[in-house]
């Protein structure tokens, strides 16, 4: 697996769809939870992610599309197969390209990457105005060097928090907007400004290294 926590594993493998290509296999083991409400909530979150990806993949080629998904009731797990994104996470990219002092070229590349993040979210917002990612962070952004264009390309993954109509302190510390932290289990209006805040935090980290 390329990612593991208490309930979720994400595998990177290959599937055959006329040809071999990379795929992410996301497995949510809801059977490990004793609380029925928590179990149903996790399943609903993953279903929301599948539904969201179906819509978002029509808006941009820079997000993964869902190939297949099912509820494996025998093993008490929910499985989603989606296209893998090329490259490495922005977190891994930043670790590899860490500099004590950024040069003009480093700043230019980072600026271009941030612009691409904004453009992807803009394209999604134009076609799907109600969607807010809610968990933009370096781990959910992939960077790949395109050998044909000689440029770095950006991809965005993990829309599992999008389309949730309530705030449950979702998101990741250091990238959450104030409105994500202030109210818990209360219906509120979240806009794309929440994602803009996260992008600002990401840009700050890319330029200052913290």
Language-model segments: which ranges?
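ATP-binding glycine-rich loop module of kinase domains
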Residues: 8-47
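Conserved end of the kinase activation segment
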Residues: 180-192
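Catalytic-loop of the protein kinase fold
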Residues: 125-144
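Short beta-strand micro-motifs within the conserved protein kinase catalytic domain, predominantly
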Residues: 65-78
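Activation segment/activation loop of eukaryotic-type protein kinase catalytic domains
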Residues: 139-175
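Conserved short submotifs of the Hanks-type protein kinase catalytic core
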Residues: 75-89
């Amino acid at each position: 697996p390329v990612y593991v926590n208490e309930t979720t594993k994400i595998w990177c493998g290959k599937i055959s769809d006329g040809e071999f290509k990379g795929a992410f296999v996301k497995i949510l083991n809801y059977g490990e939870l004793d609380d029925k409400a928590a179990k149903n909530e996790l399943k609903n979150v993953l279903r929301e992610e599948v539904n969201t990806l179906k819509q978002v993949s029509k808006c941009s080629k820079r997000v993964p599309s869902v190939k297949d998904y099912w509820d494996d009731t025998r093993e008490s797990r929910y499985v989603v197969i989606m296209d893998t994104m090329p490259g490495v996470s922005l977190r891994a990219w930043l670790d590899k390209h860490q500099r004590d002092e950024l040069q003009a070229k480093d700043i230019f590349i980072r600026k271009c990457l941030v612009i691409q993040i904004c453009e992807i979210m803009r394209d999604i917002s134009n076609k799907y105005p109600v969607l807010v990612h809610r968990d933009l962070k370096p781990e959910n952004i992939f960077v790949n060097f395109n050998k044909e264009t000689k440029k770095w390309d950006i991809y965005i993954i993990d829309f599992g928090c999008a389309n949730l109509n309530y705030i449950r302190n979702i998101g990741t510390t250091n990238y959450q907007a104030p409105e994500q932290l202030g109210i818990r289990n209360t219906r509120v209006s979240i806009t794309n400004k929440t994602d803009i805040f996260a992008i600002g935090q990401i840009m700050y980290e890319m330029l200052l290294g913290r």
